[in-house]
Amino acid sequence: MRALLFLALVGAAVAFPVDDDDKIVGGYTCQENSVPYQVSLNSGYHFCGGSLINDQWVVSAAHCYKSRIQVRLGEHNINVLEGNEQFVNAAKIIKHPNFDRKTLNNDIMLIKLSSPVKLNARVATVALPSSCAPAGTQCLISGWGNTLSSGVNEPDLLQCLDAPLLPQADCEASYPGKITDNMVCVGFLEGGKDSCQGDSGGPVVCNGELQGIVSWGYGCALPDNPGVYTKVCNYVDWIQDTIAAN
């Protein structure tokens, strides 16, 4: 689930209705297998997303950690066996050593699969960033998370949302004192379009590169509270070093 940071501490997320017909919130159903790097993390049920970065490694959010995870690839409808899926258990699950559960700084995790997956048109990797993308860059967010800003509707079909990277100043103004250099906001200050609970760990891909990981936010799709994402470009060395050592 995307972390409802701070609001969860008072017992419930306070979210106001924006449009109860929205997808992801405010997105659309992805074309089948158009996001072949998207994975579902499963522990008897879908609980988080992730991104395939090579044939044996997935990147997700550290707050999605569970001791046992099955990674499901090639999915579109996560409640129907469509024949294209690959289910692989996690062999190693490695949270960033400086992950802070309270602030969600360094909210990134690597999963080594027990065996390499077969890459094809439905299961493919996404590139790590060659550099940090500038504000205004258009990106694709995807996941099977809640599609309502008020209430719960968990979709069967993978949802997509096109959204821009926001200036860091806007991000910091939306969440005073909460944004670190390892976080980036993506979305719309006017609200109405956002990732939500269940999308956590999933990808933000800009120009073919994984620039963000769904991390946290106040509610979903609320005005002046855009989604906050782990800034993947800060972790390329850690990712590469961790893979090499494991």
UniProtKB/Swiss-Prot annotation:
Residues 16-23 form a propeptide. Its cofactor is Ca(2+). The keyword Amino-acid biosynthesis does not apply. The active site is at H63, D107, S200. InterPro entries: Peptidase_S1_PA, Peptidase_S1_PA_chymotrypsin, Peptidase_S1A, Serine_Proteases_S1, Trypsin_dom, TRYPSIN_HIS, TRYPSIN_SER. It is an enzyme of class 3 (hydrolase). The record marks D194 as: Required for specificity. Transmembrane segments: none annotated. GO terms for molecular function: calcium ion binding; serine-type endopeptidase activity. One of its GO terms (biological process) is collagen catabolic process. Its main location: secreted. One of its GO terms (cellular component) is extracellular space. Belongs to the peptidase S1 family. This is Anionic trypsin-2. It comes from Rattus norvegicus (Rat). The gene is Prss2.
